Amino acid sequence: MLGLIGKKVGMTQIFQKNGIVVPVTVIEFQPNYIIGKKTVDRDGYSALIAGSVDLKGSKVSKPIKGQYKSLKDIEPKKYVIELKGLDGYDAGDEIKVDVFKSVKYVDVTGTTKGKGFQGAMKRHNFSGGPSSHGSKFHRHLGGTGQATTPARTFKGTKMAGRMGGNQQTIQNLEVVLINEEKRAILVKGAVPGAKGSFVVVKKSKK
């Protein structure tokens, strides 16, 4: 599966030839290198291991250094992904942005913005209680328990709690523009995460 590790720069808009304004997300790519391979004989399946963004020296342990011994001039990477079904690359090769030239739609995986502890109305889109005078609750989630049987609250019941900070994938985002010089692509619509967060862009599955 064709893919790259990139950084979400932010959102903007562009005009199409017919004058329609399209909201787009700018995703910038630092060099992505093949840092290893998985084989059927050794691992049970074949895949390429790609990495991007140099890891800070103080965070590089001896086991990590050992993984990069055979790679010349490539520093240990902070973000690493597996790419299945991608051929024609060897360890040390760079995957460039132009691989998306023939791709029309992509799936983008990122980490959603963390919202902290939130109530049921914001977290689960509950309607809340009456807003009028006399009501004793306005933003409460309502009842959470059962009757005498089973006399307990079921696990997984939607309640207030920590919101955001989860991995999320948005599928079938259209590739609007590819800028090889700036190592960036523009995709139609929004992608998960805050500005500056790292995302994985892969050729759409569907």
Swiss-Prot record:
<dbReference type="InterPro" id="IPR019927">
    <property type="entry name" value="Ribosomal_uL3_bac/org-type"/>
</dbReference>
<dbReference type="GO" id="GO:0003735">
    <property type="term" value="F:structural constituent of ribosome"/>
</dbReference>
<protein>
    <recommendedName>
        <fullName>Large ribosomal subunit protein uL3</fullName>
    </recommendedName>
</protein>
<dbReference type="GO" id="GO:0006412">
    <property type="term" value="P:translation"/>
</dbReference>
<dbReference type="InterPro" id="IPR000597">
    <property type="entry name" value="Ribosomal_uL3"/>
</dbReference>
<dbReference type="GO" id="GO:0022625">
    <property type="term" value="C:cytosolic large ribosomal subunit"/>
</dbReference>
<feature type="region of interest" description="Disordered">
    <location>
        <begin position="127"/>
        <end position="151"/>
    </location>
</feature>
<comment type="function">
    <text>One of the primary rRNA binding proteins, it binds directly near the 3'-end of the 23S rRNA, where it nucleates assembly of the 50S subunit.</text>
</comment>
<dbReference type="InterPro" id="IPR019926">
    <property type="entry name" value="Ribosomal_uL3_CS"/>
</dbReference>
<keyword id="KW-0687">Ribonucleoprotein</keyword>
<dbReference type="InterPro" id="IPR009000">
    <property type="entry name" value="Transl_B-barrel_sf"/>
</dbReference>
<keyword id="KW-0689">Ribosomal protein</keyword>
<dbReference type="GO" id="GO:0019843">
    <property type="term" value="F:rRNA binding"/>
</dbReference>
<keyword id="KW-0694">RNA-binding</keyword>
<keyword id="KW-0699">rRNA-binding</keyword>
<comment type="similarity">
    <text>Belongs to the universal ribosomal protein uL3 family.</text>
</comment>
<comment type="subunit">
    <text>Part of the 50S ribosomal subunit. Forms a cluster with proteins L14 and L19.</text>
</comment>
<dbReference type="Pfam" id="PF00297">
    <property type="entry name" value="Ribosomal_L3"/>
</dbReference>
